[in-house]
């Protein structure tokens, strides 16, 4: 290769040599660029379900039905009762970078919707065939579109109820290599089911229904009761024992990270991290920082090599989180990561301390703190921001209500955690 020769020899070479060694820069064709973009957004059937679910939730839907066949590889349908798409906007649905959620660059600094990139529908249609039927309240007819290879191939007007139905068929029909790397149909179905579980946890006010191969493995009522959702996911016995995390009334004016949700007791451990669900401002994310804070809060309460379970709903100012990191929108960056780490750890830790005695000394080691499984109140306040001056007291009736100091809490320092979590993965 020319690059391996000394400069003096390179200068003496004839020009014909360079013609064969130089790779000219070319502008990618629309077809190739579409496939590259689609590959980042649509990795597997569950990716399609995720994008369609987020569109439905952003549209204000209160009922969402998901139907799949062959693990979503042959067909995926998502039907909602949301606002629908006005006739004037329908032709733009499958255009790349077309969205109703962002207008200016400043909007990217304060994103409040689940979707915002304007790539989902375009990317899905680039790797499958998509049929969209939609209607709105104030229009007499709705619209039907069929898109293929990123282009609309059919369009008509039909009578339809308000809401939207999207049916995706023959996923990766022109991508045999991508189909080859998909897992079994049952494994892909499992990924979709897990995804629907997650969205139902963060939106208990929405009724979800999942139909797979004509069976209904999962549904929720939309009653806005997180414990009812957990009953649908894990069963009544497990859900009834879980601990609910709520914001204390005295902290309503707090402007830092607010941690709420539901979590398992120390007896409800799992063999891996796949049952740790983290949501930031209603968005499911993967975060080593938050996951590690959640785990470390259980230190001393459960055995080593076991992992907690639960769903934490964390709210922070939108300007303190950057969700525009990756097209999949599951990776985010935090402006005040240490504050978030501390708030999560204190919220979870204090929940556990309300249910277990606080010893006068709490040596580190493999010992497991005794947990009172019978004392599980239906609701209790647990959030405690790290910057508030006063120190929480134990509300366990079995304790002497002494002040819980950092030595008792065994709270892991944020700086130490950064070093300790180098090999940590959020879901394993």
Q: Can you describe what each PLM-predicted range is?
A:
Residues 1-22:
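N-terminal amphipathic/basic-hydrophobic helices that include classical n-h-c signal peptides
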